[in-house]
Amino acid sequence: MAEKKEWWKNAVIYQVYPKSFQDSNGDGIGDIKGIISRLDYLRTLGIDAIWLSPVYRSPQDDNGYDISDYQDIDPMFGSLADMEELIAEAGKRNIKIIMDMVLNHSSDEHRWFVEAKKGKDNPYHDYYVWRDGKEGVPPNDMTSAFGGSAWEWVPQLGQYYLHQFSVKQPDLNWDNPKLRKELYDMILWWMDKGVGGFRFDVIDLIAKEPDRKITSNGTRLHEYIREMTANTLSKGN
């Protein structure tokens, strides 16, 4: 069983960037049906898995790494049914699908963040990282990877939210067990659909400690990863 679960150690993994891989409908954008049409070609290369860059529903502020719905496919790439077909057809050719997964942040258009901005008492408010403050005076001098402050002012709340990337990518609050359970349930949902694995983008940032200006490899990082593995990946193959 251990050997089966560690197939990835010796696997040949081929990354597919969907926008530019294969366009099936002539709109100039690669899509899932295009990938399906090339599976036989990919099989001839001798690959064991496809690492699929983000295809989730997204405003595309950061090439799909700003996810507004983890359980839907962006229309530019097709539909959820197309994704299910890709998983099934790849499986027939002994090719696993590894999905890019972003758990450090979501899009600001995700329903969680839309709700979070409605008030400090909203149950989704604590899904994100907030600090009280004054306009023009961020909590500290942390900077975004994309430049400028990592804090964005929300006047109706009198608070700043943390974004280590684009202002449209608010950081998720992994200290909140309810948030973690939502993410684990979502991962299991994809695993139930037959996804073979995940490539976790910037996973080292999930345990950030903004008050200490620690952005990566925070104190609880290994705790979170062990918990996530126990609740998700350990249940698959």
Label for each model-derived stretch:
Residues 2-184, 192, 203-237:
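Acidic/aromatic-lined carbohydrate-recognition and catalytic surfaces
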